[in-house]
Amino acid sequence: MGELLAGRPRPLGSHFDGEGVNFALFSSGASRVELCIFDGLREQRLPLTARTGDIWHGYLPDAQPGLCYGYRVDGAFDPSRGQRFNANKLLLDPCARQMDGWVVDDQRLHGGYHQPDPSDSAEVMPPSVVVDEHYDWQGDRLPRTPWSQTVLYEAHVRGLTRRHPGIPAAIRGTYAALAHPVMLDYLTQLGVTALELMPVQQHADEPRLQSMGLRNYWGYNTLLPFAVDNSLAASDDPLNEFRDTVRALHQAGIEVILDVVFNHSAELDVDGPTLTLRGIDNASYYWLTENGDYHNWAGCGNVLRLEHPAVLHWVIECLTFWHEVCHVDGFRFDLATILGRLPDFSSSAPFFTALRNHRSLRDCKLIAEPWDISPGGYQLGQFPAPFAEWNDRFRDDMRRFWLHGDLPIGVLARRFAASSEVFERGSRQPWASVNMLTSHDGFTLRDLVCFNHKHNDANGEQNRDGTNSNFSFNHGTEGLEADETTQARRRVSQQALLTTLLLSQGTPMLLAGDEFGNSQQGNNNAYCQDNALAWLHWDQADDALLAFTSGLIRLRRSIPALQRGRWWRDDDEDDVRWLNAQGEALTPYEWEQGTHQLQIQLSERWLLLVNATPQVSDFSLPEGEWRVAPPFSATDHLLDGQTWRGQANAVCVLVKQ
């Protein structure tokens, strides 16, 4: 390996050009930066003497992909001013595409409290790895499904595939399993158009979980945002395995949306390890108080500071990597309010401006989780176009309407119409409302109708973790086991919830497994359960519920009013009509105080009937000859073509002949 040359300041990270590797690292407060090269246990330290602005850089001739490296960054250790430099700590490149190994908690990883910790961390710190980004995409084309035709499917790579009997055991639980024909066929037959993957960025397990023998299964503890998580790979080449999977999904017409975490890092609070950003430029990367402590708006010990130009550049470059190098179609941003903090939230924050102006990111699907845990954190409806947003009002109101009956028909209608009172502003369209009943965070749909209370004891926190505001209803018996009458009522509730989800205006999101009744045994916070509790139970699938769900998605595609990218107009019968059980327009009283009965006529030809009452009720239908539309049973209670006898808490869809 030749002498270290000056190299160039851009792009950040390590980049192989066919003849050598360029290294570039941002640090505004460092006094010295050393590039550390590893050959087995042998470490060679090469000072980066070239500096352009705040970028330290060098070029290593003859270096090849697979080279293991890290950094030691020296400077002041003054926590009161936010400076925590410690050259005793080997640091990961924040732009690294791969890490060799896994972070196992060790006291030597700690950088120090009031004084720098003197122990060297190299022996216990996995290094970064140089990666060749070249890849033959074989003509891959992004599906670019219009938002108005999108059906999201939220899934965990391991959870979705680990127990699937049709996938070879050697690849179950990995990216390769997602690309297996059995899984591709399943997703296409179900009818979803986009796979929203829970985090696949390289993460680390919190020391607390490691001490209990648990893992951060969900992965919302990002360590290296540019790196494909190696724990989800079947091969020793995670990047290319992931790209193979993206290409296979695209060939099946399925988009790939990544759940990304840019609100905090795996370094946690002051008690956490010094692995990368803290030791490189703590004061630039993190939001700090006046005395140098970490803000905790994400509830994870630290908060990334996207208001800083260098941090913003880092995040935008990371998203560009995933989109342009890995061909992902979009992103869901975890605790996205933090991304717009200045420190108060602003819809015109630099991050949003950078996305809108970017050459390619502006065309991606962008989804915000529109809250964080700090004051002013709840920002539903406040994100700028072209963002869509997870709509927790849809989730909670639909649960309350169907399972508790404590909301009027008017609330159901507002949620059914893409929560227009929240999202219809500026240039935003109905698809901006991502409608959901469940997500990874909370009960599954099956558990929602089987448990009144969470059962999270396996998480090791005495059942204190996880929300208590579930709006669930066990139908009289706590737990999965119940008599047939109770089970029948639960099935009716699941069907009603799924119908209003998949036939509402907006963008529906289905949690993987809800389509066939998957359960997590009442655990509503399975973030640390990398085991059979959280993996999908394919062997227990309810085939009838699966057929019903896929039929609803097909029905959704056939209704023009649900495929349009514009808001419904009440005066346009080709959009929607809201009728009472007598087939007449609802009165103001009925909207807010009337019985829980409604007829929703869509595009003139389709009629969604809602009887959310505890008794059988007859509905007088609008003029026309009606029949029951699949996936609803042809034997459903259509009496004479003009009357529907609705069972308690039931829904049905009719189509005009």
Curated annotation (Swiss-Prot):
Keyword Hydrolase among record annotations: yes
Leading EC class: hydrolase
Gene3D superfamilies in UniProt: Glycosidases (3.20.20.80), Golgi alpha-mannosidase II (2.60.40.1180), Immunoglobulins (2.60.40.10)
Keyword Magnesium (UniProt): no
Ranges for region Disordered: 458-485
A GO biological process held by the record: glycogen catabolic process
Thermal behaviour (record text): Optimum temperature is 40 degrees Celsius.
Activity modulation notes: Slightly activated by Ca(2+). Inhibited by divalent cations such as Zn(2+), Cu(2+), Fe(2+), Mg(2+), Mn(2+), but only slightly inhibited by EDTA.
MF-aspect GO terms: glycogen debranching enzyme activity; hydrolase activity, hydrolyzing O-glycosyl compounds
Compositional bias segments (type: Polar residues): 465-475
Key words, A-Z: Carbohydrate metabolism, Cytoplasm, Glycogen metabolism, Glycosidase, Hydrolase
Record localization: Cytoplasm
pH dependence: Optimum pH is 7.
Similarity field: Belongs to the glycosyl hydrolase 13 family.
Function comment: Removes maltotriose and maltotetraose chains that are attached by 1,6-alpha-linkage to the limit dextrin main chain, generating a debranched limit dextrin. Hydrolyzes the alpha-1,6-glycosidic linkages in amylopectin while does not hydrolyze the alpha-1,4-glycosidic linkages in amylose. Native glycogen is a poor substrate.
The protein, known as: Glycogen debranching enzyme
